[in-house]
Amino acid sequence: MFSGASAINLDAKGRIAIPKRYRESLHACHNNQLVITVDIQSSCLLLYPIHEWEQVAAKLASLSDTQPTERAIKRMLLGYAHECELDGNGRMLLPPPLRQYANLDKRAMLVGQLNKFELWDEAAWQQQIEQSRIAILNEDLAANERLADFSL
């Protein structure tokens, strides 16, 4: 389970280093293997441990090739999907098309989302957080059945 937001940097070769706090789990449970793809709703990347990606791929396989929206989702997620393995220093190379999609240049944020990570350009992440905060403040949470009794 992954949580927390970590500021990270891309090196000159387009590599990121996964923070140490996640590396042991990625090594022990997922053999250092990840799949990177795009987020179809935001300008960020999604990093799935290989076993989590297999579940996503099974869901994608169930989508129709004849229904345009379903086909477009498959095309985006599978077309950009890139398998990678962490090196001995916990680094992974981000392919140029994926870096371009998420506008990643130097400074980035790696955000744990339970079963996966999101990878954001740092400025885009800050903007997204502010937009989310405002949206939550303006939302009538009681009107949302799923959130009406939600408490932390």
From Swiss-Prot:
Hydrolase found in the keyword field: no
InterPro entries the UniProt entry points to: MraZ, MraZ_C, MraZ_dom, MraZ_N, MraZ_sf, SpoVT-AbrB_dom, SpoVT-AbrB_sf
Keywords: Cytoplasm, DNA-binding, Repeat, Transcription, Transcription regulation
GO cellular component, one term: nucleoid
Compartmental location: Cytoplasm, Nucleoid
GO MF term set: DNA-binding transcription factor activity; transcription cis-regulatory region binding
A biological process term (GO) from this entry: negative regulation of DNA-templated transcription initiation
Main location: cytoplasm
SpoVT-AbrB domain boundaries: 5-52, 81-124
Origin superkingdom: Bacteria
Similarity comment text for this entry: Belongs to the MraZ family.
Subunit: Forms oligomers.
NCBIfam families, per the entry: division/cell wall cluster transcriptional repressor MraZ (TIGR00242)
Protein name: Transcriptional regulator MraZ
Organism in which the protein naturally occurs: Shewanella pealeana (strain ATCC 700345 / ANG-SQ1)
Organism ancestry: Bacteria, Pseudomonadati, Pseudomonadota, Gammaproteobacteria, Alteromonadales
